[in-house]
């Protein structure tokens, strides 16, 4: 052993760290994109641009599953059990459509969860216990309606949630500046 018996060790800053999942890459401006090479061809299937690496990886997984079958190496093998694989060849356009649908759903879900976390965690810091319970409920895939209703009532009634405006957060597209000015 010429190398002194040292196994291959991942060095920080290597490509593995830049690409957390197979089949995706990050653009300079922070978006994650997914693409896959068609079998026996030089062409690539463009699977879309996403805001999270998980969404891009799920789009890639869907495409590789339909292109290469159930034996394909997936990023999230546990998340594709409901899919039925058929031996019939699917067109590239059909595979792209299925993959982009999955990626868009994951991206939208991630964005919705992120927005709710910003709304609750960024503005309501009065109760750490409530925040921990809210986070735990999100991890379990559920959110109690009474918490949501209570937050909405406080927002509408001019409660403490609006007293602490986070200037680093983008405004909700549903509310306008005119609504804010008319209330104050």
UniProtKB/Swiss-Prot annotation:
Residues 20-77 bind DNA. CDD domains: AP2. GO terms for cellular component: nucleus. Keywords: Activator, DNA-binding, Ethylene signaling pathway, Nucleus, Transcription, Transcription regulation. One of its GO terms (molecular function) is DNA-binding transcription factor activity. Residues 174-184 have a biased composition (Acidic residues). It holds the Pfam family AP2. SMART domains: AP2. The keyword Nucleotide-binding does not apply. Residues 161-172 have a biased composition (Basic and acidic residues). It is found in: Nucleus. Its main location: nucleus. Residues 123-184 are annotated as: Disordered. The keyword Transmembrane helix does not apply. GO terms for biological process: ethylene-activated signaling pathway. Belongs to the AP2/ERF transcription factor family. ERF subfamily. Probably acts as a transcriptional activator. Binds to the GCC-box pathogenesis-related promoter element. May be involved in the regulation of gene expression by stress factors and by components of stress signal transduction pathways. This is Ethylene-responsive transcription factor ERF010. The gene is ERF010.
């Amino acid at each position: 052993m010429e190398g002194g018996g040292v196994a291959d060790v991942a060095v920080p800053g290597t490509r593995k760290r830049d690409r957390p999942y197979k089949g995706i890459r990050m653009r300079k401006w922070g978006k994650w994109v997914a693409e896959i090479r068609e079998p026996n061809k030089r062409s690539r299937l463009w699977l879309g641009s996403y805001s999270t690496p998980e969404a891009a990886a799920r789009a890639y997984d869907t495409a590789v599953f339909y292109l290469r079958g159930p034996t394909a190496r997936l990023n999230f093998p546990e998340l594709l059990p409901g899919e039925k694989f058929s031996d019939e060849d699917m067109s590239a356009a059909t595979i792209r459509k299925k993959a982009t649908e999955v990626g868009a759903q994951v991206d939208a879900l991630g964005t919705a969860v992120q927005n709710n976390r910003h709304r609750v965690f960024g503005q309501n810091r009065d109760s750490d216990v409530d925040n921990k319970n809210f986070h735990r409920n999100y991890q379990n895939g559920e959110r109690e309606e009474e918490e949501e209703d209570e937050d909405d009532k406080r927002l509408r009634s001019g409660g403490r949630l609006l007293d602490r405006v986070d200037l680093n957060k983008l405004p909700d597209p549903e509310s306008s500046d005119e609504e804010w000015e008319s209330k104050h």
